[in-house]
Amino acid sequence: MCYADSRPGQKHKSFEEVCRAIDTLVAAEGQPDVLQLSGGEPTLHPDFERILEYALKQPIHYVMINTNGIRLSNDQALVDAIALHKNRVEIYLQMDGCDDDVFQVLRGQRLLETKLRAIERLGSADLNITLVATLQAGVNESQLGKLLNLAAGKPWISGLSLQPATYSGRYFTPEQLESRITAPDCIRLLCEQSSGELTEDDFFPLPCAHPNCHVLSLCYRHEGKLVPLTRFVDAASNRDLLANGLSFTRDEGKRLAQLYLARNNCCGPNGCSTNDANNNCSSDSTSQSPAQTSAQTTAQAAGPLVVLDKNPAALADEFFAKAIEKQIGSKQMLRITITSFLDAYNFDVRRVMKCCTHHVLPSGHIIPFCAYNVLYRNGHVPLPDLKHPLVSDIATRNQPQ
């Protein structure tokens, strides 16, 4: 299974080509939120470490490495080299389930031991991981609860990404279209397999994209448990705070917490501080914020995910105080995302027009992810001429060796 149709016998892009693509992204975005190095398998590129170093010299918040983890499970030197940049690198690790039969069907090998070894090796190096599962009906839809438990138990796993199978590239099986897994299926399965600890109300669309493309749930880690932020945050009324990104630095976390508290009248006259978060919005306050009210009304049905011996309003105060103190980072959160990619059978121009995930090509083109996979990757449609002069200039200039 590979939407990129990767296979033996193909060639790597040169170091110079990859650098041109990175420069194109920076020129277009200024300070990109995330750059993902993908493939094929990027860790097999002969210049992989040079490419990573080049990317990290650019004004990019985070660099993700999209990998099957096989090399990382065995190559400590490579893990150590990546770990030098652990504050700006995240491993986007292919992890389709917690049973070997799943890997045998989807990947042609029994890879569970290899994957678990990679997870432990990366955790020992203090590298953050997002587990990425491709979901196929009849194969691994029963694995979501196991993956959630795996992620919840290891604080260096900062994300769980669920991706229903896309019928393009090296996974073209139209006879299985009737059993396609959808984003609502994923939400239902997560709720069922977490024994109701997650609820449908814990999920909301990622604002930067079309609502049918990305669904998100953010969970706060507290005393070994996960607490969805929706238990004490009014996400529906504040989605615009997440409008331009998905990955947040501690500085950005502080800024967002202050904005949220200010909107909900939780701050003092001089703005939001740690004391304001604790005092103005504490459980002892006679005038509670909307966040606290939401926390109290949902806690009764929250299940064992929520710490039951702690006042939910106090839990909200704790979270916001830590965020303002810049103590909320990747290891204090778990990000659950559901991404529904497009193929020829469900292609939707409206979704493509709202896409916030793009392929960046050495030619200077920046193309919506699914449009590239469906239309341009295999040459079904020729790439359009470049019209932006800055991008055109970057695409044609030489890169230093």
Predicted segments, located by residue:
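Local cysteine-cluster metal-coordination motifs and their immediate loop/turn environment
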Residues: 1-4, 268-276, 280-283, 349, ...
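Canonical Radical SAM [4Fe-4S] cluster-binding loop centered on the CxxxCxxC motif
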Residues: 1-16
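A short local loop/turn or secondary-structure capping micro-motif enriched for an aromatic residue
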Residues: 9-10, 235-239, 375-378
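Short, solvent-exposed loop/turn segments at secondary-structure boundaries
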Residues: 11-14, 104-108, 172-175
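Radical SAM/AdoMet-radical enzyme domain recognition
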Residues: 19-36, 45-164
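Conserved G/P- and acidic residue-centered "switch" motifs that form tight phosphate/ATP-binding loops
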Residues: 41
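Radical SAM enzyme [4Fe-4S]-AdoMet core and its adjacent flexible, acidic
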Residues: 124-330
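C-terminal target-recognition/interaction regions appended to catalytic cores
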Residues: 315-401
